[in-house]
């Protein structure tokens, strides 16, 4: 059993952020493959968000110490907890350091010593190594992904000269650049561009989010809609838009990856994102990178993306082949050393006699069936070594005959 432990001080609520979507999608893919998996929450009881994920098994614990009693492979999500587990534990670090420390009672710096750490991007691995001041050279990266719903959703047809549609789907916190976005609307380069801006209320369950939400509701240029609770509904929302903006700040927060960017491109949208953190790693053909915390640069990026229009069918297809849930879970199983990964990576074919592995055998009087005649196992690994050995033996035989 692979148990994902939600270590956040907030419940596991759908639509609140990428960490929830990332984790739920991986659990679903594991279950689809027949690998037991579940979500564990601590201290919330059954009010932990499970109603948003009816297809995922949940286990509610009263305290972190109960984790020590489980015979599971523990994968902490957000940050590790200071618990001695029965088996090697892992932690997927979804946020940059040291943001966990602020008002989170479960956070302990010492908890990072035991579990094996996994990051969501190459950028994240770098900043965590520097923060922890330890050699984590083998810290693996397990990239997030876009649910298949995003690549499959149909984009509705719109009147040819209708205003472009721009979407901000990040959480309503300053980290995500919502204030930069508001400031960008004041620049002349956008005032003459016909477009409509939609913002979801994701993250409005926090104090900061509720304040921002009230402000947005009074803005004449912004339409506020409910955050979508599942991939299918989110995909439909994105498909109605041409551009998705991700103006994440670089001052007091750094985006480790950016799932929304991947999902948007799979849905056929252009993305305007800050050249910050792990966001550049999300560019699969449809991203315009702009200077972070710069409203004027953001306005120019939005204008450029609107002029380019949504991705073409060909561009969307190419983008959708990258960052899939299958690839993400393959990487996860590899990082966990799970036997399912080992089995799935075993060779499923053998090279036939006379293939390109054996072209040199004919030069030494050996037939194309030489490997079979020599009783060799035809696996990709053994074939090369045995064929090379046979060739060397044949050369020695020829050389010996020449001397005689």
Positions of predicted regions on the chain:
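Nucleotide-activated donor-binding/catalytic signature segment of Leloir-type glycosyltransferases, i.e.
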Residues: 209-232
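Conserved acidic donor-binding segment of nucleotide-sugar-dependent glycosyltransferases
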Residues: 285-295, 303-310
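Nucleotide-sugar-dependent
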Residues: 248-261, 280-281
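A conserved mid-protein helix/loop that constitutes part of the nucleotide-sugar donor-binding site
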Residues: 21-25, 173-187
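Short hydrophobic beta-strand element within catalytic cores of glycosyltransferases
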Residues: 266-273
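Glycosyltransferase donor-sugar binding loop
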Residues: 43-45, 196-210, 227
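A charged, aromatic-enriched C-terminal amphipathic alpha-helix characteristic of glycosyltransferases
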Residues: 18, 60, 307-365
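A short, active-site helix/loop in glycosyltransferases that binds the activated sugar's phosphate group
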Residues: 101-103, 113-138, 146-150
């Amino acid at each position: 059993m692979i148990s994902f432990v939600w270590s956040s001080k907030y419940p596991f609520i759908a639509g609140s952020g990428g960490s929830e979507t990332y984790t739920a999608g991986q659990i679903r893919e594991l279950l689809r493959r027949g690998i037991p998996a579940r979500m564990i929450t601590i201290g919330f009881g059954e009010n932990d968000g499970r109603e948003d994920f009816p297809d995922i098994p949940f286990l509610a614990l009263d305290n972190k110490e109960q984790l020590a009693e489980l015979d599971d492979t523990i994968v902490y999500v957000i940050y590790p907890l200071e618990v001695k587990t029965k088996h090697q534990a892992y932690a997927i670090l979804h946020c940059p350091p040291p943001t966990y420390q602020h008002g989170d009672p479960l956070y302990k710096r010492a908890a990072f010593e035991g579990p094996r750490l996994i990051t969501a991007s190459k950028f994240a691995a770098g900043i965590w190594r520097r923060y922890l001041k330890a050699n984590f050279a083998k810290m693996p990266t397990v990239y997030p992904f876009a649910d298949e719903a995003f690549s499959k959703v149909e984009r509705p047809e719109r009147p040819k000269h209708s205003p472009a549609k721009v979407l901000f789907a990040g959480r309503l916190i300053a980290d995500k650049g919502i204030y930069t976005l508001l400031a960008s609307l004041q620049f002349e380069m956008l005032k003459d561009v016909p477009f409509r801006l939609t913002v979801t209320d994701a993250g409005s369950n926090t104090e900061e989010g509720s304040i921002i939400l009230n402000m947005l509701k009074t803005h004449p240029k912004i339409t506020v809609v409910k955050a979508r609770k599942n991939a299918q509904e989110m995909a439909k929302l994105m498909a109605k838009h041409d551009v998705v903006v991700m103006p994440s700040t670089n001052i007091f927060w750094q985006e480790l990856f950016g799932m929304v960017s991947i999902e948007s491109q799979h849905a056929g949208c252009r993305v305007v994102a800050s050249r910050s953190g792990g966001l550049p790693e999300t560019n699969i053909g449809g991203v315009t990178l702009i200077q972070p915390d710069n409203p004027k640069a953001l306005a120019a990026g939005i204008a450029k993306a609107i002029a380019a229009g949504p991705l073409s069918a060909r561009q969307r297809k190419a983008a959708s082949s990258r960052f899939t849930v299958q690839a993400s879970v393959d990487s996860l199983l590899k990082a966990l050393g799970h036997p399912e990964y080992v089995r799935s990576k075993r060779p499923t074919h053998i090279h036939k006699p006379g293939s390109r592995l054996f072209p040199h055998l004919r030069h030494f009087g050996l037939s194309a069936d030489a490997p079979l005649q020599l009783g060799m196992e035809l696996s990709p690994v053994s074939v090369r070594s045995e064929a090379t050995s046979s060739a060397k033996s044949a050369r020695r035989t020829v050389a010996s005959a020449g001397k005689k």
